[in-house]
């Protein structure tokens, strides 16, 4: 996961062949609710014009009482064994193609793709997020915050060709699960049912976090994603993986030594390294340590804020606590904005090692 993970027509309808509705949900009137119900029953989705001129998300409008959209996951028609096969192919490619990024491998960038494709969600109108798999479109893939993620997307394309029934939203998020688990991280509960949406449903750029801000920015940014302080600190612990790249984010360096193993090292380094604020070759300020590690200002903000600091210390002292909280928070991030059927199964995948592969 790179630094940019912190800088982080008239109403129309088309028929889906799968049991899915992309629906406008009425918030106060029975009429709007009836429209939504009929749309789902007829296997249609409704959309409204995006005349937004800022980064706060789509404007409500086309349907009188509508304030947001509903992302309905289609009912499961595959079993855990089917998705385990997809998992295994991603994991095998991860294991075999290990020279990427100076032998860091593809794990961290797969986690970053899952994070970024999910992190565009806005709780105010339920737009964005992982549901529609919209990273595959130019508008989202060329968001400056997503620089470098084309490598992860290309890595996953052969998997999509072998398993064409999986949606891009499911593929991108499952790739992140593989990245965490195969790099010795915790189990990540995962549910399928995302459905690819058309290009005009791509969220606006500017929804991903910046890396050069303070604790107030971090807290306010994550409010849009509906995360509390503990979940924020847990999610940022994914920076144990990978490194920053000047050409992608404007920052340079690894967060620690074990950058392809998922541990609580991020918190230990925050507390124990001799950090100095310095300007890098791009002219951006970052915290550097004598060991060659770096922290973004938004990383360092976690020890400048008293509430965040308590949690950093807890995770530094107890990796199991970090793993438990990260698993819950990351699974929640991947599902933000999606309504799953009550009986939708939760898949828990075995690693290649656990399968003896």
Swiss-Prot record:
Its EC number is 1.11.1.5. Residues 189-212 are annotated as: Disordered. Binds 1 heme b (iron(II)-protoporphyrin IX) group per subunit. It is found in: Mitochondrion matrix; Mitochondrion intermembrane space. The active site is at residues 116, 255. Transmembrane segments: none annotated. Keywords: Heme, Iron, Metal-binding, Mitochondrion, Oxidoreductase, Peroxidase, Transit peptide. Coiled coil: none annotated. It comes from the Eukaryota. It is an enzyme of class 1 (oxidoreductase). It catalyses: 2 Fe(II)-[cytochrome c] + H2O2 + 2 H(+) = 2 Fe(III)-[cytochrome c] + 2 H2O. Its cofactor is heme b. One of its GO terms (biological process) is response to reactive oxygen species. Pfam families: peroxidase. Destroys radicals which are normally produced within the cells and which are toxic to biological systems. Forms a one-to-one complex with cytochrome c. This is Cytochrome c peroxidase, mitochondrial. It comes from Candida glabrata (strain ATCC 2001 / BCRC 20586 / JCM 3761 / NBRC 0622 / NRRL Y-65 / CBS 138). The lineage of its organism: Eukaryota, Fungi, Dikarya, Ascomycota, Saccharomycotina.
């Amino acid at each position: 996961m790179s630094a940019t993970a912190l800088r982080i027509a008239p109403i129309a309808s088309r028929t889906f062949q799968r049991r899915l509705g992309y629906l406008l949900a009425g918030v106060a009137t029975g009429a709007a609710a009836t429209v939504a119900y009929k749309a789902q029953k007829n296997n249609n989705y409704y959309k409204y014009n995006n005349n937004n001129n800022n980064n706060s998300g789509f404007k409500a409008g086309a349907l009188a009482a509508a304030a947001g959209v509903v992302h309905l996951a289609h009912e499961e028609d595959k079993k855990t064994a089917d998705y385990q096969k997809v998992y295994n192919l991603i994991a095998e490619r991860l294991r075999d193609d290990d020279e990427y990024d100076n032998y860091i491998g593809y794990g961290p960038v797969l986690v970053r793709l899952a994070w970024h494709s999910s992190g565009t969600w806005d709780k105010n109108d339920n737009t964005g997020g992982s549901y529609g798999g919209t990273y595959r479109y130019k508008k989202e893939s060329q968001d400056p915050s997503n620089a470098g993620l084309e490598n992860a997307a290309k890595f996953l394309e052969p998997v999509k060709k072998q398993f064409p029934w999986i949606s891009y939203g499911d593929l991108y998020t499952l790739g992140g699960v593989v990245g965490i688990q195969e790099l010795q991280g915790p189990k990540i509960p995962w549910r399928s049912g995302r459905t690819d949406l058309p290009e005009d449903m791509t969220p606006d750029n500017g929804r991903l976090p910046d890396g050069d801000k303070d604790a107030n920015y971090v807290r306010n940014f994550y409010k849009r994603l509906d995360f509390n302080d503990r979940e924020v600190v847990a999610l940022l612990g994914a920076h144990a993986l990978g490194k920053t790249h000047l050409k992608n984010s404007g920052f340079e360096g690894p967060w620690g030594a074990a950058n392809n193993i998922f541990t609580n090292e991020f918190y230990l380094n925050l507390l124990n390294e001799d950090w100095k604020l310095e300007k890098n070759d791009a002219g951006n300020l970052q915290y550097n340590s004598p060991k060659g590690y770096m922290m973004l200002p938004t990383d360092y903000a976690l020890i400048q804020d008293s509430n965040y600091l308590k949690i950093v210390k807890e995770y530094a002292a107890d990796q199991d606590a970090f793993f438990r909280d990260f698993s819950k928070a990351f699974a929640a991030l991947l599902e933000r904005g999606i309504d799953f059927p009550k009986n939708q199964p939760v898949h828990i995948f075995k690693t290649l090692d656990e399968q003896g592969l």
